Amino acid sequence: MAEGNHRKKPLKVLESLGKDFLTGVLDNLVEQNVLNWKEEEKKKYYDAKTEDKVRVMADSMQEKQRMAGQMLLQTFFNIDQISPNKKAHPNMEAGPPESGESTDALKLCPHEEFLRLCKERAEEIYPIKERNNRTRLALIICNTEFDHLPPRNGADFDITGMKELLEGLDYSVDVEENLTARDMESALRAFATRPEHKSSDSTFLVLMSHGILEGICGTVHDEKKPDVLLYDTIFQIFNNRNCLSLKDKPKVIIVQACRGANRGELWVRDSPASLEVASSQSSENLEEDAVYKTHVEKDFIAFCSSTPHNVSWRDSTMGSIFITQLITCFQKYSWCCHLEEVFRKVQQSFETPRAKAQMPTIERLSMTRYFYLFPGN
């Protein structure tokens, strides 16, 4: 009997020490205001008995679970101080995502999933080059300042967001800003001749500016003297006749610009005015496109921020709503969805019209296979 009491005494001591330690941890969380409690919540905790403190804490921890978890790690393992709002890898996070999760991290495709899809859909998807040997390139052209048009305030958010996204997808990104139509064409032609395309498996072109139905506005655009880079010109520069290095490889064109004119409020509109088609678009050029498009133009997909004749909207403090939704959908779904599915997710996010409505549109789709980005692979 005495021996039994002797054995129980150390256990009671350990139990008491454990309670004291846990209570100290919980007190630390409250004192550092990790849970962002109001004074009455703190009072309720401090007034509770020791055995009730865990229950009181649990009732208030759901919304602050991540922050409290990091503080617990710091307390138990004495790791370096990390801000509760700081992420270890802000641009990448292993997939798959949890249901209903909101995140600003790019979900990575598990290597096993990458291998499975490559094997099962080998005849249906574009081949992906080895990460260590490929040299993917992307080009962003963004005009924000104009001689005769209002500035595109907030476009810097679009540049930053798209650059980070494409770099996360393993593209080296070139950024060109505030170019005339002629300079935009020169930049595109120079980009098309880059030798890195030979060892790449795809490319992205991101064009952001004021726009009209037929193309993207340069920085000196005026109603009386248009300065417009025609969309047809972009496709001609990168077709299989003029850019052999990207033959049979996905060429993704993303356009944030109006494709018509309309008046609006609250949001800044990406349209200079109601303009007629530029006279520089000759019928001869159109005939050439019509004859050779089937033979020369292949493996393209264009994703425009709005339907023809309509405007696109931009928040001057946050960036374009199209680019914002595009980045979000790439982050959430590119690990498991092919490109067209990701674009459809973007369209679905605009399905219910808002106060200022627009509908992103997939156009000039000539891809013969599915294009998976397989982030992280």
Swiss-Prot record:
Keywords, alphabetical: Acetylation, Cytoplasm, Endoplasmic reticulum, Hydrolase, Immunity, Inflammasome, Inflammatory response, Innate immunity, Membrane, Mitochondrion, Necrosis, Phosphoprotein, Protease, Secreted, Thiol protease, Zymogen
Region ranges (Disordered): 84-104
Protein known as: Caspase-4
Tissue: Widely expressed, including in keratinocytes and colonic and small intestinal epithelial cells (at protein level). Not detected in brain.
Region of interest called Required for LPS-binding, as start-end residue ranges on this chain: 1-59
Family recorded in the similarity comment: Belongs to the peptidase C14A family.
Species in which this protein is naturally found: Homo sapiens
Modifications the protein undergoes after translation, according to the UniProt entry: In response to activation signals, undergoes autoproteolytic cleavage and activation. (Microbial infection) ADP-riboxanation by S.flexneri OspC3 blocks CASP4 autoprocessing, preventing CASP4 activation and ability to recognize and cleave GSDMD, thereby thwarting the inflammasome/pyroptosis-mediated defense.
Superkingdom field: Eukaryota
Catalytic activity: Strict requirement for Asp at the P1 position. It has a preferred cleavage sequence of Tyr-Val-Ala-Asp-|- but also cleaves at Asp-Glu-Val-Asp-|-
Effect of R314A: Abolished ability to cleave Gasdermin-D (GSDMD). Abolished ability to cleave IL18
Organism placement in taxonomy: Eukaryota, Metazoa, Chordata, Craniata, Vertebrata
SUPFAM superfamilies associated with the record: Caspase-like, DEATH domain
